[in-house]
Amino acid sequence: MRSDNIKKGINRTSHRSLLRACGLDDNDMKKPFIGIANSYTDIVPGHIHLKDLVQEVKEVIRLEGGVPFEFDTMAVCDGIAMNHEGMYYSLPSREIIANTVESMAMAHQFDALILMPTCDKVVPGMIMAAARLNIPAIVITGGPMMPGKFHGETVDFINVTEAVGATQSGKMSEEDLYELERCACPGAGSCAGLFTANTMACLTETMGMSLPGCATAHAVSDKKVEIARASAKKIFTLLENDIKPSDILTQEAFENAIKVDLALGGSTNTTLHIPAIANEVDGVDVTIDLFDKLSHEVPYICSIRPGGNNRMIDVENAGGIPAVMKNMESILNTDCITCTSNSVKENLEKVSDIDYNVIHTLDDPIRTEGGIAVLYGNVAPNGCVIKQGAVNEDMLVHSGPCKVFNSEEECVLAIENDEIIDGDVVVIRYEGPKGGPGMREMLNPTAAIMGRELFHVALITDGRFSGGSRGPCIGHISPEAAEGGPIGAIENGDIVSINVKERTIKLELTDDEIKERLSKVKPVERNLKGWLKQYQKLATSADKGAILK
């Protein structure tokens, strides 16, 4: 056992002495040590229930003959960190989480890992660590939040963000906004639509790192407890058969994840997180070009908020990710091994009772292309991304005058002052991995635009978007402004033309004009210290997953 490195032999006497201080006895020293990375915290709705859920996991580990060791790692709620300086820390937290889990597992030589994340950066951060460590591991994602009810309508967190703009523009009363605030988020779980957290949970299940049904089993459900207990039992199968993340996280498994992502119309943040996870696995190559290549091949078959009206509970009731994968079986790599110790094909054999009104077949798609597209052009020579599944057909092609801002705050103020009108192309720059730093989410600007019913405004940025953003929002523009990217040359009144169908984004200037402007640009300087200063020095471009180098 790997844990023998800290508990076996005379040279480990002092180590055992410390373990005995933790309550272990002679019999425990013969058992496998199972590390449990728990991201419980009191301030993140997606994580508040993990304190209780982990007790179920520990109980099963003891029953199965192991010794559970719970340790904590951080979790940031992007909704609470939104639209202030806290959002600079959200994406960088992914690296801290990965490093924390790696450090704990190496320092204490766990034989296997159970990972318990829920929200946006915690899921990829933990899987990045599992891939680095390459010891048997299984993921128990915390599960979605139930939606709320407001005046008879089903609502979620994004309804609240957009309602702020509606209230500021006189389309909603403050009394109704207050009522909505109180009922939209009724309890534990990740926000109720297919936003980043739930997208990553779905892809974790697709890749085979969590048990079938885990992603859509809601946080407050008995099913989530059952899956948590089953996962704790399954870790021993993985340990006994030496099935490691490198056996599961293959090139084919990543391609399956991207295909399901495209079929669901998932968050554009997956174009950061999936390449970042893949970067930790030898022999795997995942780029944003792969997303776009597959987007031409994989149809959009399940319309979920923010791209549609369904929420995660509807997907759960329709059969969950097993049903989605069953409908896609003909285009998936079904020989991939999963944490069940069986293949994808074997996992799907008994899947039935699919609600085809929610999860369409490949022959009856909602749209013929996948939910994410990658655009190129003189604004983004290295690419940028758009969730085309959440864009109205009439905005897939758009050309308009630019309103340019060097920060999210400047843009939000302009929207609140009614300076943005239909037809505009809003440009927010110096919000990339290095420029922010930290590549903040632009949910407040997009929600403010939608709340004001400015449905013919496009927004482009070297920052990123919440999984809850909808409309013609183009992010991850690479290279970013802080790295001398052409987005830094755009001026108020310039025309930018977007054609999602042709995958192009163009600033209507010549190459020489852009070069001349860039030669005169004075980059925005940030007064940084601490972790953000370190992150800025190490962060790579969005088209590389914003990983650290």
From Swiss-Prot:
InterPro entries noted in UniProt: Dihydro-acid_dehy_C, DihydroxyA_deHydtase, DiOHA_6PGluconate_deHydtase_CS, ILV_EDD_C, ILV_EDD_N, IlvD/EDD_N
Binding site for Mg(2+): 78, 120-121, 441
Single GO cellular component term: cytosol
Entry cofactors: [2Fe-2S] cluster; Mg(2+)
GO MF term set: 2 iron, 2 sulfur cluster binding; dihydroxy-acid dehydratase activity; magnesium ion binding
One GO biological process term: L-valine biosynthetic process
Bilayer-spanning residue ranges: none
Binding residues for [2Fe-2S] cluster: 119, 191
Pathway named in the protein's UniProt entry: Amino-acid biosynthesis; L-isoleucine biosynthesis; L-isoleucine from 2-oxobutanoate: step 3/4; Amino-acid biosynthesis; L-valine biosynthesis; L-valine from pyruvate: step 3/4
Modification sites for N6-carboxylysine: 121
Cofactor binding remark: Binds 1 [2Fe-2S] cluster per subunit. This cluster acts as a Lewis acid cofactor.
Keywords, ordered alphabetically: 2Fe-2S, Amino-acid biosynthesis, Branched-chain amino acid biosynthesis, Iron, Iron-sulfur, Lyase, Magnesium, Metal-binding
Active-site feature positions: 466
Subunit details: Homodimer.
HAMAP family noted in UniProt: IlvD
Family per record: Belongs to the IlvD/Edd family.
Protein's UniProt name: Dihydroxy-acid dehydratase
